[in-house]
C-alpha cells in the first residue's frame, strides 16, 4: 500500500504521554510489524512514521506561533533516543513529586534515578535535536527544543508545587491537567498590588494568632501558624466562586486554624472571639459586614467548634453565602454533613418529580488533617459518595492541612502510605502537593482545583504541606516528644516573614511599609480587645431551652379527606401504557385498589406511600435514602417500579395530581455514618424538606453512632441547629439472631432530654401514617425535632398491624393506644401491662385465642419520648383496684425501654401498687442465635404477661 504523505493526520490528535505510546509502538513496528495491534499496524502502513506539527515562534515575536511539521525518523538509533526522551518526560510527570520542594522544613534530595538522563542513555545534545512538541506540546514560547522541554518539565513538576494525576483514568481529564500544568495557564500572574494585599492577609493571619497567644496565655486556640497560607488559599476559592456566581460555598473543618478562618474568611468579629476567650457576653457585638448566622444553643460549645455564615456580594450584585459548619471534636465526621448542605443548596424541590440539581449553585470545601485523612474511615465513606447519583455534589475541593504530625504521632506511625493524600488515588482524584511557605503557589493550587471542579464536576485534593509551630494545643510542649522536628521549627521563619522578605528583595515593598502593616493589624486587634467587657464574674448564663422546645408539640391536623385518599390511592396504582410490572408484584399492589371505597384495611407500606403522597400535596418535598430503600429491605415498599422487559423505572409518587413538591428515593451505598451525616446536613440546610434515612436493620444504626451522639441528639442544644430528620430503624425479635433484632432503643432513650428528639415504637399502620404527616407539618416550626421510629419487620404484613381506612380519614396520632376489648370493667382490672412496638401485636394475637381477661388491661406506649405522662396517668386512674403495673418487653432487662420506663412508672404508680418487669433477663448480647430458643423465650414472655398470679 502506498504511504500517504503531506498530512499530519491521524497523528495530530496524539501528544504528551499518548504520543509517547504511539512512538513506542512505532519502534516495535520497525522491529516486527506483526507484533503490534493490527489497526495500529494498518495506520503505520498507510501513513508511515508519525508526523507531528510543532508550534514555532518567529525570532522577532515570542507570542506569534506558526507550525513546523516533523516526521519521526526511521533510523533505529535516532528513534530509540526519541523514545527514551518521551519516557523521561513521562517519568518527570509521574514521579517528579517525589523530589519536589514541597516540605518547608526539610529539602528533599533532588536526584532520583528514573529522572536522570543517564538512566535513559541520553545527553543534552541528544535532547536538543528533538522537537519540543514530542516532549511538551503545551510548553511556553521560550522553550525551544527537547532539552529546554525537559528543564521546563523539571521546573514545573519538582518545585514548590507538585502533581499526581496518573491515577486519573479519564483521558480528557488527564490531558486537560497536563495542558493546564505545563502551559502554566492555571498559575495566577499577580500584580504588585495583589502581592502586597497577599502580604497584608498573611500579616492579619499571623497577627491574630500572636495577639491571642500573648493575651490569653495558656488557653487553647489550635493555632494555624505554620499553615498560614490556608487563609489566602480559601480566599482565592471564595473569590473564584463569587466570580463564577456560585450561590453558596460550604466549608467543613476541624479545630486547627478554625478561629482564624472564622475571623478572616467568615468575617466573625474579633470582639466576639475575644469575648469567648474571656467568657464574656459576645452576642451584643454587631457582626462585621456580611457576617450572619453566628448561632448558639442554650448549653453552647467551645469556641473552636462553632460555625458561622457570611454573605458576600460581587460587582454585578450577585450574592453568595459562605457557611462554616458547626463541628464536634470528632475528626472528619462533619464531612458528609457539609456535602448534605451542598446538595440541598443545589436542588430545586418546588416541583413534582425528582429535584432539579444544579451543581454550579454550590460547592463544598473540606479541610482535613494529615493524620485524620488516612486514619478516619468516614473519609473513605464520604469520598465514595462523590459520583453516586443520590449524593454527588459536582465535586468537592479537599484541603489537607498537613502539619506533618498528629498530636505527638509522626507520620511513619500514622499511615502506611507515602502521602497523607494517597487514599484519594483510589477514587481517581487528582492531587496537588504544595509548600505552605509559598503563598503564591497555594493560590495557584486553588485556581487549578477550582477550574478542574468546574469543568469535570469531580473532587480535587490540595495537600497543603506546612508545620505546626506549637504543640497540639498551646499548653503542650512538643520538644518532649518531637525534639528533632521542633528544633527545626523553632528556627524557621514564619510564612509572613519569608514572603515579606521576598517582596522587599524584589522592590515591591519597603521594610518600613512592612512594619507599618504589622502595626496597623496590631492596633485593630487592640481596639477590638478593649471593646470586650471584663466582667465575666457577673455574667449569669441561662442554660434553659427556649419555650418552643420545652412545650409539648402543637396539635396539627394529620387526617385526610376520604375522597382525597381514594383518588390518591387509585393514582398510585396507575402505570403507563406498555409498562410491564413484575406479575407477582402487580397482583400485590392491585389489592390496594378500592380500599377507601370499601373501608378496607391498609398495611404498613401502603400507609407509608399514602402519607408520602398527601405530604407532597401539602407542598412538602420528600427525600428518602437507605440501603435498598427503593424496594425496602423486606420487599414491602416498591416506591420505584421496574419494567421487567426494559428495566425502565417508574415512580408513581411523581404522578400524583395536586403534588406541589419533589420526591426522591435513593438506594444508598453500604454505609451508615456518611449517609446519615449527609441526610442530617441536607435537612439542616433545607429544613422544609421531609428527609428520611432508613437503616437496613436497626442493629446497624450504631455504625453511625457518632452522628446520633454529636449532631442529631445535641446539635440544637450546642449550636442552635434545628433538624427534623426522620430515622427509620427496623426493630423486633423474630429469631434472626443478635444482629437482626434490635435497633437498641435504649441508647436513644438514654440520650433523650430537653425534648431533643421524638422516639416512637409504633404498632399500627395508621399510627405510622399520622406521625409522618405530623412531622412534615412541623418542619418549618420552632417546635421541630428529629424523629426516631423503631419500624417493624414481621408487622409489615400482619393483619393486626393493618388499620381500617376510616382511621386515616378521622384519626390522629396517639402517643398511647389501649388494647381493644380489654379493661372494660374497670373495677376488675388488677394488672396493667405496658409495652411498646411489635410485642404488643404478639400479645394481641395471643389474647384473641384466650378466654376472659377482665383482670387485665394492656397499654401500648407508642411514643416513648417525650413520655406521655398525662395520658398514662389518666389510664391508671381509671382502675381503682389495680395491684400491679408491669412493663413487658422482648429485649434483655439491661436493654430496651425498661430502664427508661421503670422510674416513670414508679412515679405514677398509686401507693401500694407494685411495678414489675417481664422480659428477657440481663444479657451481653441482644438476642439468641437459635430460632428455637428464641421462640421459647417469646412464648415465656407472652405467657407471663397474660397469666394472672394467684
From Swiss-Prot:
TM regions (residue ranges): none
Keyword field: Glycolysis, Oxidoreductase, Thiamine pyrophosphate
Protein EC: 1.2.4.2
Cofactors named for this entry: thiamine diphosphate
Catalytic activity: N(6)-[(R)-lipoyl]-L-lysyl-[protein] + 2-oxoglutarate + H(+) = N(6)-[(R)-S(8)-succinyldihydrolipoyl]-L-lysyl-[protein] + CO2
GO biological process: glycolytic process; tricarboxylic acid cycle
GO molecular function terms noted in the UniProt entry: oxoglutarate dehydrogenase (succinyl-transferring) activity; thiamine pyrophosphate binding
Superkingdom per UniProt: Bacteria
GO CC aspect terms: cytosol; oxoglutarate dehydrogenase complex
Protein task: E1 component of the 2-oxoglutarate dehydrogenase (OGDH) complex which catalyzes the decarboxylation of 2-oxoglutarate, the first step in the conversion of 2-oxoglutarate to succinyl-CoA and CO(2).
Family of the protein in this entry: Belongs to the alpha-ketoglutarate dehydrogenase family.
NCBIfam families with a match to the protein in the record: 2oxo_dh_E1, PRK09404.1, PRK12270.1
Subunit structure as annotated in this protein's UniProt entry: Homodimer. Part of the 2-oxoglutarate dehydrogenase (OGDH) complex composed of E1 (2-oxoglutarate dehydrogenase), E2 (dihydrolipoamide succinyltransferase) and E3 (dihydrolipoamide dehydrogenase); the complex contains multiple copies of the three enzymatic components (E1, E2 and E3).
UniProt name for this protein: 2-oxoglutarate dehydrogenase E1 component
Biological source species: Geobacillus kaustophilus (strain HTA426)
Amino acid at each position: 500500500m502506498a504511504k500517504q504523505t503531506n498530512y499530519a493526520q491521524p497523528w495530530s490528535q496524539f501528544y504528551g504521554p499518548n504520543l509517547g505510546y504511539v512512538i513506542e509502538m512505532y519502534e516495535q513496528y520497525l522491529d516486527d510489524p506483526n507484533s503490534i495491534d493490527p489497526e495500529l499496524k494498518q495506520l503505520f502502513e498507510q501513513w508511515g512514521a508519525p508526523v507531528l506539527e510543532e508550534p514555532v515562534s518567529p525570532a522577532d515575536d515570542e507570542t506569534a506561533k506558526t507550525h513546523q511539521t516533523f516526521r519521526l525518523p526511521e533510523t533505529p538509533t535516532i528513534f530509540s533516543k526519541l523514545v527514551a526522551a518521551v519516557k523521561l518526560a513521562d517519568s518527570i510527570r509521574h514521579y517528579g513529586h517525589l523530589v519536589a520542594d514541597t516540605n518547608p522544613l526539610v529539602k528533599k534530595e533532588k536526584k532520583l534515578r528514573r529522572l536522570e538522563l543517564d538512566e535513559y542513555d541520553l545527553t543534552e545534545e541528544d535532547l536538543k535535536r528533538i522537537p519540543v512538541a514530542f516532549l511538551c506540546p503545551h510548553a511556553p514560547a521560550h522553550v525551544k527544543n527537547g532539552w529546554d522541554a525537559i528543564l521546563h518539565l523539571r521546573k514545573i513538576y519538582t518545585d514548590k508545587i507538585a502533581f499526581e494525576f496518573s491515577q486519573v483514568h479519564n483521558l480528557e481529564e488527564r490531558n486537560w491537567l497536563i495542558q493546564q500544568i505545563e502551559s502554566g495557564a492555571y498559575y495566577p500572574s499577580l500584580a504588585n498590588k495583589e502581592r502586597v494585599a497577599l502580604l497584608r492577609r498573611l500579616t492579619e493571619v499571623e497577627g491574630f494568632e500572636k495577639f491571642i497567644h500573648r493575651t490569653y496565655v495558656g488557653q487553647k486556640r489550635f493555632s494555624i501558624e505554620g499553615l498560614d497560607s490556608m487563609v489566602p488559599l480559601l480566599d482565592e476559592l471564595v473569590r473564584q466562586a463569587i466570580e463564577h456566581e456560585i450561590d453558596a460555598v460550604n466549608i467543613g473543618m476541624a479545630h486547627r486554624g478554625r478561629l482564624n478562618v472564622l475571623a478572616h474568611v467568615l468575617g466573625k468579629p474579633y470582639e466576639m472571639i475575644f469575648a469567648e476567650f474571656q467568657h464574656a457576653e459576645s452576642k451584643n457585638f454587631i457582626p462585621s459586614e456580611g457576617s450572619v448566622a453566628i448561632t448558639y444553643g442554650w448549653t453552647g460549645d467551645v469556641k473552636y467548634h462553632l460555625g458561622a455564615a457570611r454573605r458576600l456580594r460581587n460587582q454585578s450584585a450577585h450574592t453568595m453565602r459562605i457557611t462554616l459548619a458547626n463541628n464536634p471534636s470528632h475528626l472528619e465526621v462533619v464531612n458528609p454533613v457539609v456535602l448534605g448542605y451542598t446538595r440541598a443548596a443545589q436542588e430545586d424541590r418546588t416541583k413534582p418529580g425528582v429535584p432539579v440539581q444544579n451543581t454550579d449553585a454550590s460547592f463544598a470545601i473540606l479541610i482535613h488533617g494529615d493524620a485524620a485523612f488516612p486514619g478516619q474511615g468516614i473519609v473513605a465513606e464520604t469520598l465514595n459518595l462523590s459520583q453516586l447519583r443520590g449524593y454527588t455534589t459536582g465535586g468537592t475541593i479537599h484541603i489537607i492541612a498537613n502539619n506533618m504530625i498528629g498530636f505527638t504521632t509522626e507520620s511513619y506511625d500514622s499511615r502506611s502510605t507515602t502521602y497523607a493524600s494517597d487514599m484519594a488515588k483510589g477514587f481517581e482524584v487528582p492531587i496537588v502537593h504544595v509548600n505552605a511557605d509559598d503563598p503564591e503557589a497555594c493560590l495557584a493550587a486553588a485556581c487549578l482545583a477550582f477550574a478542574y471542579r468546574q469543568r469535570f464536576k469531580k473532587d480535587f485534593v490540595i495537600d497543603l504541606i506546612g508545620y505546626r509551630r506549637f504543640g497540639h494545643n498551646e499548653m503542650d510542649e512538643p520538644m518532649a516528644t518531637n525534639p528533632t522536628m521542633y528544633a527545626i521549627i523553632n528556627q524557621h521563619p514564619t510564612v509572613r516573614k519569608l514572603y515579606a522578605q521576598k517582596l522587599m528583595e524584589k522592590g515591591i515593598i519597603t521594610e518600613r511599609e512592612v512594619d507599618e502593616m504589622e502595626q496597623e493589624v496590631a492596633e485593630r486587634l487592640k481596639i477590638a480587645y478593649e471593646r470586650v467587657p471584663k466582667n465575666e464574674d457577673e455574667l449569669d448564663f441561662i442554660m434553659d431551652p427556649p419555650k418552643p422546645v420545652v412545650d409539648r408539640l402543637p396539635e396539627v391536623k394529620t387526617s385526610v379527606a376520604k375522597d382525597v385518599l381514594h383518588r390518591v390511592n387509585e393514582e398510585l396504582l396507575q402505570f403507563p401504557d406498555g409498562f410491564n410490572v413484575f406479575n407477582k408484584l402487580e397482583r400485590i399492589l392491585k389489592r390496594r385498589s378500592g380500599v377507601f371505597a370499601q373501608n378496607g384495611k391498609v398495611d404498613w407500606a401502603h400507609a407509608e406511600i399514602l402519607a408520602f403522597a398527601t405530604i407532597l400535596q401539602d407542598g412538602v418535598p420528600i427525600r428518602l435514602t437507605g440501603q435498598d430503600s427503593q424496594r425496602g429491605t423486606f420487599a414491602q415498599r416498591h416506591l420505584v417500579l421496574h419494567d421487567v422487559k426494559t428495566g425502565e423505572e417508574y415512580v408513581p409518587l411523581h404522578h400524583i395530581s395536586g403534588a406541589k413538591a419533589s420526591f426522591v428515593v435513593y438506594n444508598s451505598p453500604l454505609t451508615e455514618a456518611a449517609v446519615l451525616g449527609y441526610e442530617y446536613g441536607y435537612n439542616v440546610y433545607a429544613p422544609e424538606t421531609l428527609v428520611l434515612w432508613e437503616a437496613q436493620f436497626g442493629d446497624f444504626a450504631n455504625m453511625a453512632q457518632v452522628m446520633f451522639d454529636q449532631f442529631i441528639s445535641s446539635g440544637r442544644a450546642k449550636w442552635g441547629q434545628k433538624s427534623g430528620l426522620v430515622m427509620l430503624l427496623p426493630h423486633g425479635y423474630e429469631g434472626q439472631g443478635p444482629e437482626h433484632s434490635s435497633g437498641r432503643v435504649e441508647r436513644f432513650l438514654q440520650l433523650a432530654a430537653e425534648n431533643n428528639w421524638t422516639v416512637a415504637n409504633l404498632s399500627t399502620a395508621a399510627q405510622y401514617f399520622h406521625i409522618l404527616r405530623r412531622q412534615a407539618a412541623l418542619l418549618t416550626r420552632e417546635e421541630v425535632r428529629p424523629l426516631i421510629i423503631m419500624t417493624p419487620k414481621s408487622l409489615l404484613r400482619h393483619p393486626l398491624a393493618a388499620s381500617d381506612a376510616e382511621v386515616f380519614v378521622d384519626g390522629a396520632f396517639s402517643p398511647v393506644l389501649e388494647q381493644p376489648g380489654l379493661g372494660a370493667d374497670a373495677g376488675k382490672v388488677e394488672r396493667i401491662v405496658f409495652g411498646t412496638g411489635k410485642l404488643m401485636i404478639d400479645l394481641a394475637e395471643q389474647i384473641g385465642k384466650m378466654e376472659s381477661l377482665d383482670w387485665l388491661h394492656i397499654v401500648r406506649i407508642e411514643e416513648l419520648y417525650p413520655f406521655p405522662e398525662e395520658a398514662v396517668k389518666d389510664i391508671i386512674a381509671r382502675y381503682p383496684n389495680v395491684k400491679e403495673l408491669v412493663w413487658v418487653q422482648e429485649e434483655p432487662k439491661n436493654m430496651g425501654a425498661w430502664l427508661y420506663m421503670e422510674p416513670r412508672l414508679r412515679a405514677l404508680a398509686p401507693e401500694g401498687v407494685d411495678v414489675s418487669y417481664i422480659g428477657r433477663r440481663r444479657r451481653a448480647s441482644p438476642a439468641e442465635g437459635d430460632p428455637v430458643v428464641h421462640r421459647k423465650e417469646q412464648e415465656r414472655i407472652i405467657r407471663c404477661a397474660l397469666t394472672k398470679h394467684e
